[in-house]
């Protein structure tokens, strides 16, 4: 038999009293209705008693008030303060109201509408709003006392003893075990990932210190370096700087960018971004070297590359050949950059006072900009100073290669080395690590050989040259007095004695 017309609601009480439904059921259709819900306050108390719950300790004291809310629906006519409309949009499809005072729109709910009126500044500014607030029609009866402690966790169940991982156990509880266990720190929970770059620095600590603290750098910073030694070194640095350009280009040719949904977080793409910036930096650096020579009138001869310089160039070719990995090449590039920075930071520590000239650093992240080059005839018609190479060292070279911007560029190179090591090392990484150690150690050792032996040291004040014989004494005297002093190194002790 088909179901009768749905002219009634689905309320259980209506069905029980509906004659059409009774006749339909008598004909053998449908099934018995579920019994009415007996849940009420009396049933709840009976249920608690049947399971042994004792609610006697929850009785309120005589001085306590039951937290209640005034029946705003029966005392206030919300139609006076809200306009009702039906929202049939796709997202809502419900009855909504709009505040006549401020235009606030929300779903129809008398309690929430009353809550809005208590916070509506436009409504409270009216005379009617002030009257309702004064009469207490919009104020909830706030509970005067704190709820029982069992509801806020101050008195937990004695059978639920929780062991807190802290230095001090909760009050009223007995610590479990002989002593309380301290909470582990964030550092122990999140250990730092292994760093290949830091490993390379640690395993070559002594070798790196000897390379970046060469006696040539101490003389360069203190102002006692001869012009001949400076010109020899600058000529060799020119060969290394020019060789960096094809070396970096070969590394770019090794990059194969994969198909990925997040290209900017791919290590090979980030490496490509760094190498493109490095090529721009190298071009700027070559321009910087030539501009500084012209500006300070430096007479650098066309010396042939020395054996150490040739070995450095061969190392560039070896680390960028087809059999070498991209990681090896990036390790060598970072090694050269950090050798420049650490060396001239060491030389800068010997400068007595900071020069008042503007910083000449041409590095930025990731590339740098160079001030406009000086004209070739900057020294035309002027008397060339004898200490022009010392001035160029302090005002140009040292400031450029120990600047903060260059330091950040070196840090970026280091981070890329670690990213590539995490992504491209194969197996247990032992073979890749050994290859990187070999390249890094060769670069550090060759760097120390590029510096010429400081044989022609320019002397300063007579008294200063006689007082000190060792390098550390000269460092302290130079920093305290600011005078040009003679510094003897372990390679030229006899030569310095003859000069005195």
Swiss-Prot record:
Cellular-component GO terms for this entry: nucleus
| Stretches assigned to coiled coil | none
Where it sits in the cell: the answer is: Nucleus
Q: Where is the signal peptide?
A: none
Residue ranges, compositional bias (Polar residues)? 475-484
Q: Where is the composition biased (Basic and acidic residues)?
A: 459-474
* Keyword line: DNA-binding, Nucleus, Transcription, Transcription regulation
From the UniProt entry, list the residue stretches annotated as the region Disordered: 161-197, 457-500
Gene Ontology molecular function terms on file: DNA binding
Q: List the disulfide bonds.
A: none
* Protein purpose: The two putative transcription factors FPSE_09188 and FPSE_09189 could be responsible for orchestrating expression of the W493 A and B biosynthesis cluster genes. W493 A and B consist of six amino acid residues D-allo-thr, L-Ala, D-Ala, L-Gln, D-Tyr, and L-Val/L-Ile linked to a 3-hydroxy-4-methyltetradecanoic acid polyketide chain.
Alphabetical list of PANTHER family matching this protein? REGULATOR PAB1642, PUTATIVE (AFU_ORTHOLOGUE AFUA_3G11955)-RELATED
Record's protein name = Probable transcription factor FPSE_09189
Native organism is Fusarium pseudograminearum (strain CS3096) (Wheat and barley crown-rot fungus)
């Amino acid at each position: 038999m088909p179901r009768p017309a749905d002219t009634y609601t689905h309320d259980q009480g209506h069905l029980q009293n509906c004659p059409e439904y009774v006749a339909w059921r008598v004909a053998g259709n449908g099934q018995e209705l579920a019994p009415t819900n007996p849940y009420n306050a009396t049933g709840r108390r009976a249920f608690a008693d049947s399971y042994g719950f004792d609610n006697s300790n929850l009785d309120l004291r005589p001085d306590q008030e039951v937290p209640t809310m005034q029946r705003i629906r029966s005392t206030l006519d919300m139609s006076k303060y809200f306009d009702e409309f039906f929202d049939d949009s796709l997202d809502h499809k419900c009855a909504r109201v709009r505040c006549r005072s401020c235009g606030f729109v929300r779903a129809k709910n008398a309690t929430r509408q009353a809550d809005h009126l208590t916070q509506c500044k436009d409504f409270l500014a009216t005379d009617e709003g002030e009257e309702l607030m004064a009469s207490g029609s919009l104020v909830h009866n706030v509970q005067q006392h704190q709820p029982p402690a069992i509801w806020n966790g101050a008195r937990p169940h004695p059978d639920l003893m929780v062991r807190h991982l802290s230095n001090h156990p909760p009050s009223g509880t007995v610590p479990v075990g002989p002593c309380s266990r301290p909470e582990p720190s964030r550092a122990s929970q999140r250990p730092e990932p292994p760093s290949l770059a830091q490993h390379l620095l640690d395993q070559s600590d002594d070798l790196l210190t000897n390379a970046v603290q060469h006696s040539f750098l101490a003389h360069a910073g203190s102002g006692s370096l001869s012009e001949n030694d400076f010109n020899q070194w600058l000529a060799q640095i020119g060969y290394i700087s020019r060789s960096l350009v094809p070396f970096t280009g070969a590394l770019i040719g090794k990059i194969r960018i994969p198909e990925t949904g997040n290209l900017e977080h791919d290590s090979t793409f980030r490496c490509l971004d760094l190498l493109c910036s490095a090529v721009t930096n190298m071009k700027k650096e070559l321009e910087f070297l030539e501009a500084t020579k012209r500006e300070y009138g430096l007479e650098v001869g066309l010396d042939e590359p020395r054996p150490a310089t040739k070995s450095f160039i061969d190392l560039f070719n070896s680390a960028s050949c087809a059999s070498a990995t991209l990681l090896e090449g990036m390790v060598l590039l970072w090694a050269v950059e950090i050798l420049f920075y650490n060396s001239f930071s060491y030389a800068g520590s010997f400068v007595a006072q900071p020069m008042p000239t503007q910083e000449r650093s041409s590095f930025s992240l990731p590339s740098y900009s160079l001030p406009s080059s000086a004209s070739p005839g900057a020294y035309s018609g002027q008397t060339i100073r004898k200490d022009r190479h010392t001035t160029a060292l302090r005002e140009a070279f040292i400031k450029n290669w120990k600047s903060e911007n260059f330091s950040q560029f070196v840090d970026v190179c280091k981070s890329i080395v670690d990213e590539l090591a995490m992504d491209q090392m194969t197996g247990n990484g032992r073979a890749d690590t050994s290859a990187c150690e070999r390249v890094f150690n060769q670069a550090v050792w060759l760097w120390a050989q590029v510096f010429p032996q400081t044989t022609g040291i320019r002397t300063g004040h007579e008294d200063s040259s006689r007082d000190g014989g060792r390098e550390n004494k000269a460092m302290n005297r130079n920093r305290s007095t600011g005078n040009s002093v003679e510094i003897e190194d372990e390679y030229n002790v006899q030569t310095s004695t003859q000069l005195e």
